[in-house]
Amino acid sequence: MIAAATPAPPAAIGIVVRDLTLRLNNRVLFDKLNFTLDGGQCAALLGASGVGKTSLLKIIAGLTPADADTVSGSDGLPLAGRIAYMGQKDLLYPWLTVKQNITLGARLRREKAESDWADYLLAEVGLDGVGACLPAALSGGMRQRAALARTLYERQPVVLMDEPFSALDTLTRAKIQALSARLLSAHTVMLITHDPLEACRLSHRLWVLAGQPARFLTGLDLAGEPPRAPDDPAVQQSQGALLRQLLGSAE
C-alpha cells in the first residue's frame, strides 16, 4: 500500500531573479541583483553572516515583499505555492505526533491528510514506526529527518533550505546530507550553508554572496551528482577553491 502512494517527482522548474533591489534600515542590501538557477539543480549559497543570504531566501519564498516580476519560475509563472522551506530548527509542534507534524500543511489548508504518503516518507527517512510518537521522544537527528519528511510531503518543485543541518553532530549531519541529496534530486534547491564541505558534497553550483550591496562572486560548478564522497579529490579541490573565495570576500 505504501509503495503505491509514491507520486511522480515534481516537474523541475528553475528560479529566475531579475533586477532585485532591497533596502533594509537605510542599507541597500541588493541593487539590481540577477541570477538564474536551472530546474533540478542545487545551488549552495555561502557568505559572511549578515550579507543577505537569509533575506534572499525570504524574498524568493515570498516572505519579504519584492517588486512584481522580480522573482519567477523558469516557466515565467510566479513561484508562490510551489515552494517548500526547511530551516535550521525542526519547528515540530511538541503536542502533535511526528506523523501529524508531517501532514500539518494539509490540515492547515483544510485538506485531507495523505496517510500513505506520510508513511512512505517516514520509511524513506528512516523513521518507520515512530509516526505515533511525540517529538520529545526523538533525538536531534531524528527530529531533523522528520522535518525533511515534512518538507517532502508538500511535493513542491522548489525547496529552500537555511542551514538545515548545522545543529547536528558530524556523523548525523553526514548521514542526513546524503539522505536529503537523494530525496531532493528531482527538486530545485537553494541551500544556505557556512560549511564548504557540505556545499561541495550537496550542490551542483557554489555561489558566494559578498559586498554591499551584495553580489555573487564568480560561481563554481561541480561535476557529477550529489551526494559526493567527502574524500573525493574533486570535492577536496572544490572545497579549497571555495574557501579561498570566501577568505578573499572577507578582506
Regions found by a protein language model. Name each.
Residues 46-48:
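The feature captures the beta-strand-to-loop junction immediately N-terminal to the Walker
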Residues 61:
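Helix-to-loop junction immediately C-terminal to a conserved catalytic motif
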Residues 113-130:
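Conserved ABC ATPase "signature" region
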Residues 134-138, 142:
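Conserved ABC ATPase signature
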Residues 148-149:
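Hydrophobic anchor residue at the start of the ABC signature
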Residues 153-157:
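A short, proline-enriched helix->beta-strand linker immediately N-terminal to the Walker B motif
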Residues 173-185:
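Helical segment within the ABC ATPase nucleotide-binding domain
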